[in-house]
């Protein structure tokens, strides 16, 4: 969607939230939470418009903050302009350097090469293998095998900063000069938890929320957290957040009814499918001996529709 207007993905990926509540039983407030004011029981969330909303139970699912093209503006009216600006950058560039060889950087490179095979794309990654050490070497090697035919890989190296305006190349930390007229940051996400910074003993040093196995924060039993922001040793993915949500909902109901919280989170196995354009990709399922897939199967699972129909249904929108 950010690379080109092919397939008009914005028509499917930008999902309205007017049907988010089942049977319409809920109120949607479109605003940003700037802080949380805690009282002995419950408290208030403070909005950027100055309004305060009281809560008896608070669930925080604010997700991640990103850099680069996926750092979307907060105001809906600015998103379309942002998308157009990013597309122009990719269209005009001839030599693209992606800083980061995780799933975002890999999928971005595949999309670029699908649309513009003639463009030069280089991924610079700080580790000796693509992705990270959560995944076994056999999967990381398979990823390199899949992407190397179309994309240059510079491993165990880093891009020290942004491209100087008018520059035609960038020099890596190890002194390698790479021709570039566009550098795209793709080095991962950070938890979007600034709104909780005023509360004591809620955040870990890494900015994630310290939780119990019931998803309650360690400091406050009436504040729950889930998704990318929790301090749990697992890869941050939308699929995991969906699994968290069902458990949190059950525990919140138990909490307000004064019942024991029975849903206890013990983590999950790692699963990832990474597209390499529309017709290729790689995947890993962390069950049994660790299953690695590639090619047509990875494409079938994700590349054709990016799982957007399922996401739309889950948020109350039509396919």
Curated annotation (Swiss-Prot):
<keyword id="KW-0274">FAD</keyword>
<protein>
    <recommendedName>
        <fullName>FAD-dependent oxidoreductase FVFD30</fullName>
        <ecNumber>1.6.5.-</ecNumber>
    </recommendedName>
</protein>
<comment type="similarity">
    <text>Belongs to the FAD-dependent oxidoreductase family.</text>
</comment>
<keyword id="KW-0472">Membrane</keyword>
<feature type="binding site">
    <location>
        <position position="265"/>
    </location>
    <ligand>
        <name>NAD(+)</name>
    </ligand>
</feature>
<keyword id="KW-0521">NADP</keyword>
<feature type="binding site">
    <location>
        <position position="265"/>
    </location>
    <ligand>
        <name>NADP(+)</name>
    </ligand>
</feature>
<dbReference type="InterPro" id="IPR023753">
    <property type="entry name" value="FAD/NAD-binding_dom"/>
</dbReference>
<keyword id="KW-0812">Transmembrane</keyword>
<dbReference type="GO" id="GO:0005737">
    <property type="term" value="C:cytoplasm"/>
</dbReference>
<dbReference type="GO" id="GO:0004174">
    <property type="term" value="F:electron-transferring-flavoprotein dehydrogenase activity"/>
</dbReference>
<feature type="site" description="4-hydroxy-2-nonenal adduction">
    <location>
        <position position="125"/>
    </location>
</feature>
<dbReference type="GO" id="GO:0050660">
    <property type="term" value="F:flavin adenine dinucleotide binding"/>
</dbReference>
<feature type="binding site">
    <location>
        <position position="25"/>
    </location>
    <ligand>
        <name>FAD</name>
    </ligand>
</feature>
<dbReference type="Pfam" id="PF07992">
    <property type="entry name" value="Pyr_redox_2"/>
</dbReference>
<feature type="binding site">
    <location>
        <position position="228"/>
    </location>
    <ligand>
        <name>6-hydroxy-FAD</name>
    </ligand>
</feature>
<feature type="binding site">
    <location>
        <position position="18"/>
    </location>
    <ligand>
        <name>FAD</name>
    </ligand>
</feature>
<keyword id="KW-0560">Oxidoreductase</keyword>
<feature type="binding site">
    <location>
        <position position="265"/>
    </location>
    <ligand>
        <name>FAD</name>
    </ligand>
</feature>
<keyword id="KW-0285">Flavoprotein</keyword>
<keyword id="KW-0520">NAD</keyword>
<feature type="binding site">
    <location>
        <position position="129"/>
    </location>
    <ligand>
        <name>NADP(+)</name>
    </ligand>
</feature>
<dbReference type="InterPro" id="IPR036188">
    <property type="entry name" value="FAD/NAD-bd_sf"/>
</dbReference>
<feature type="binding site">
    <location>
        <position position="228"/>
    </location>
    <ligand>
        <name>FAD</name>
    </ligand>
</feature>
<feature type="transmembrane region" description="Helical">
    <location>
        <begin position="281"/>
        <end position="301"/>
    </location>
</feature>
<feature type="binding site">
    <location>
        <position position="129"/>
    </location>
    <ligand>
        <name>NAD(+)</name>
    </ligand>
</feature>
<comment type="function">
    <text>Probable FAD-dependent oxidoreductase that plays a role in the regulation of fruiting body development.</text>
</comment>
<feature type="binding site">
    <location>
        <position position="188"/>
    </location>
    <ligand>
        <name>NAD(+)</name>
    </ligand>
</feature>
<keyword id="KW-1133">Transmembrane helix</keyword>
<feature type="binding site">
    <location>
        <position position="188"/>
    </location>
    <ligand>
        <name>NADP(+)</name>
    </ligand>
</feature>
<feature type="binding site">
    <location>
        <position position="6"/>
    </location>
    <ligand>
        <name>FAD</name>
    </ligand>
</feature>
């Amino acid at each position: 969607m950010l690379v080109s207007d092919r397939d008009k993905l914005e028509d499917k990926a930008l999902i309205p939230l007017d049907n988010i509540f089942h049977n319409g039983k809920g109120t949607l407030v479109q605003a940003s939470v700037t802080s949380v004011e805690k009282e002995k029981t419950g408290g208030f969330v403070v909005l950027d418009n100055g309004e305060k909303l009281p809560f008896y139970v608070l669930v925080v699912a604010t997700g991640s903050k990103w850099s680069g093209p996926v750092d979307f503006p907060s105001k809906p009216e600015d998103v379309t302009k942002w998308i157009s600006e990013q597309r122009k950058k990719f269209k005009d560039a001839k030599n693209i350097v992606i800083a980061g060889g995780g799933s975002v950087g890999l999928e971005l490179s595949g999309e670029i090469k699908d649309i513009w095979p003639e463009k030069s794309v280089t991924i610079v990654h700080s580790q000796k293998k693509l992705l990270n050490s959560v995944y076994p070497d056999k999967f990381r090697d398979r990823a390199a095998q899949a992407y190397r035919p179309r994309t240059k890989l510079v491993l165990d190296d880093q891009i020290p900063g942004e491209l100087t305006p008018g520059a035609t190349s960038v020099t890596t930390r190890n002194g390698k000069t790479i021709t570039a007229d566009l550098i795209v940051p793709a080095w991962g996400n950070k938890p979007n938890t600034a709104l909780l910074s005023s509360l004591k003993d809620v955040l870990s040093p890494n900015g994630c929320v310290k939780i119990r196995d019931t998803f309650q924060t360690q400091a406050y039993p009436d504040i729950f957290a889930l998704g990318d922001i929790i301090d749990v040793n697992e890869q941050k993915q939308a699929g995991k957040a969906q699994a968290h949500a069902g458990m949190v909902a059950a525990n919140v109901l138990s909490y307000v009814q004064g019942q024991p919280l029975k849903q206890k989170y013990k983590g999950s196995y790692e699963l990832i499918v990474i597209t390499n354009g529309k017709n290729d990709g790689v995947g890993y399922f962390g069950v049994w001996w660790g299953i690695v897939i590639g090619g047509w199967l990875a494409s079938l699972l994700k590349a054709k529709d990016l799982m957007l129909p399922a996401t739309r249904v889950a948020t109350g929108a039509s396919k």
